[in-house]
Amino acid sequence: MRYSILKTSLLACTMIATSAAAWAGQAPGAAASADIPISHHDRIYAAEQFSNTVSVTDPVDNKLLGVIRLGDPQPGNFSPLYKGQVLVHGMGFSPDHKTLAVVSIGSNSVSFIDTATNAIKHVTYVGRSPHEAFFTPDGREVWVTVRGENYISVIDSEKFAEKTRIQVPAGPGMQIFSPDGKYGYICSSFNPETVVVSVADHAIVARVKQESPFCPNIAASPDGEQVWFTLKDVGKTQVFNAKPPFNPIKTIETGPITNHVNFARAPKGTFAYVTIGGTNEVKVFRTDDFSLVTTIPVGKLPHGIWPSGDGTRIYVGLENADALAAIDTATNKVVANIPIGQAPQAIAYVPNAAPNPDDRQNLQGLGVAGQVAHLALGPKAEAKSEQPPTSVSLFDQGLIQVLQASVTGLQPKARYVLALADKVDGSGTVQPLAAFMTNPAGSAIVNAVGPIRQIVQNSVGAERRYLVIAPGEPAKFGEAVQVQTP
């Protein structure tokens, strides 16, 4: 009897200790928590925007286990009777690692997924064009940035129902919380202002000026001292004090299409990893003096980024490569590439997500989600520059594709067209596909839909066309400044 009581007490203490340290000593948790070594119980999840899937990867083997299919690709999701999700994009997870919250921008939803079974527990619908979701550190609430409106939808994590709204500047981009759970930090994608909110009463307690209106991502350091957020349009990353008075600390020039930021805590210090979509790199910065440690080539259009539970790995979603890149933080070298679904956006590394590491229920194969073609555009021979080339991915959706171009090397705040030309040099008949305007860094993300792969890869010369970029508008544009490379 005495042995039984002692055993029960030890088990209870172990469970309490495990619960308290659930976040691990890595982001989004507190540095004081214990690290969680990489194991087969861990999972890497990626929200894949054009295949409408969530991929599930084992970090030990760096192997895709399968995908959770939340919706169908085009044109199936065009139907007025379609009930699945569209533009699977944002992602967060609960402190006990048992639930994923996955945001679908096009269907205005948050899908709650059981990490043990990969089953959808509930779908909650919110306002127009939500972007990201994350659980408060106590696990009681899920905050959703409703980017198409001007509020945070606060969802009860047990009832999966909206309990209140927090009004913020229009276009909230992302939210993250201080490791102690006291503050929520919410940047904006439409207004140059980040707000700090008291989690206890949902009141705004501070406002931080953004150097541009377009912040897609924000992260809090595990030591609770700093908040970093990215500015995608101007290619910068800002740092401010995570505690009152929430003063600005540093602005860093990071590069065109600066996407996401996250942290890895190591014996040598805490480092910030920033994905630079326009140059296909991850930049690593110290958090004490903000110096650049190294630049890591990773692949096409790096987007989401997340550390393992022990900080020995950083995983990066490659939006235009349909892959995850694994970085060894000791060497800052890419050690693995894992094929996943189409156009990964947010990713999350969840330690101890799978009680049974061999369970594959509710997972499917990639199917069409694994089919993509890659092209590149560069300056014409007479106008060569040192700017990085434009990467283009054609994501199969059956007989058509979604084209996504990560465009760089153009004039800032200028109008251009992506077009199909008769000749490889951009001459002859030119048919516009998409009009766009570059951001202040001379870059843009451009999309189009159609049977484009069949045209640009056609082996019959008379029927083949070539992708080009020309200045101007569809009704009137100039000579091509970027052309499809061999």
Write out the residue ranges for each language-model feature:
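Short, solvent-exposed beta-strand/turn "edge" segments of beta-rich domains on protein surfaces
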Residues: 393-397
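Short glycine/proline/serine/threonine-rich loop/turn segments at secondary-structure transition edges
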Residues: 454-464
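Predominantly soluble domains enriched in secretory-pathway, periplasmic, or organellar proteins
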Residues: 19-388, 398, 406, 412, ...
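Short beta-strand elements
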Residues: 476-486
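Gram-negative bacterial Sec-dependent N-terminal signal peptides
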Residues: 2-23
